[in-house]
Amino acid sequence: MSAPVFGRLLTAMVTPMTFDGAVDLRRTGELAHKLVEEQNNDGIVVNGTTGESPTTTDSEKAEIVKAVVEAVGSDAAVVAGVGTNDTAHTIELAHQAAEAGADGLLVVTPYYSKPSQAGIIEHFTAVADATDLPIMLYDIPGRTGTPIETKTLIELADHARIVAVKDAKGLVVESATVMASTTLAYYSGDDAITPALLSVGGVGLVGTSTHFTGRRMHEVIDAYVDGRIDEALSTYREILPVLTGVFAAQGATMVKAGLAHQGFTVGRVRPPQTMPTPEQAETFFGVLDRTQL
């Protein structure tokens, strides 16, 4: 089986901040390098929700892409989140990411305004037409308010540059239906249900817990793809407490706390997000320590 265009394991990376809340570009590059070299990531997703994209400026987003591209070179794909609820602005960010050296684009469904499925098709098509970069659609109705319906995904798959989906909808049968009718590469957008998506044809994971579990999750995915299902599930069960525990608070906040616990400081989150409570943090630190990650 050929490897999917973005690889099998990507981490939706947090954005390191300095003590005074500025984007720490040096630490950004160091974290990206760490995720590739130590956690065996095939790709890094920047400027996504976990990267605090709602609170970073357009110019900061461009500098983040450049820093990560410089840090990982050709060792990993760099996928830039460019999704907004404004088609024109999304296209601007797509151009900016392409100029900054991104290898692909992550484009979320327009949020808050709840466009029709026809509007969603027009939006994604316009963004796909704007650059030569391959696109991963991001289907996360719990945050956007609007799902990408099965028939919409099947229609969008006809576009040559729409090649993948980050699926955080959690409806595995619907995902299987799309995969049966298209060549879209499906990545789990929910760390804990990765084996379920793999079982119906998914290719990998865009993860959050993979800041800590990346190497082990790659083992899970590789074993599953190779047909070593018992081995895959055994490893998965060992790390499952981390896959779920990282979401006991907002993902970015728990990741930043967990990295600091392991001696790799990346600063705090920008408002309105807040860091985990001491109780939440200590519980998660215990999970990390017991799992020996």
UniProtKB/Swiss-Prot annotation:
Belongs to the DapA family. It comes from Cutibacterium acnes (strain DSM 16379 / KPA171202). It is found in: Cytoplasm. This is 4-hydroxy-tetrahydrodipicolinate synthase. GO terms for molecular function: 4-hydroxy-tetrahydrodipicolinate synthase activity. Pyruvate binds at residues 50, 206. CDD domains: DHDPS (cd00950). Catalyzes the condensation of (S)-aspartate-beta-semialdehyde [(S)-ASA] and pyruvate to 4-hydroxy-tetrahydrodipicolinate (HTPA). One of its GO terms (cellular component) is cytosol. NCBIfam families: dapA. SMART domains: DHDPS. Its EC number is 4.3.3.7.
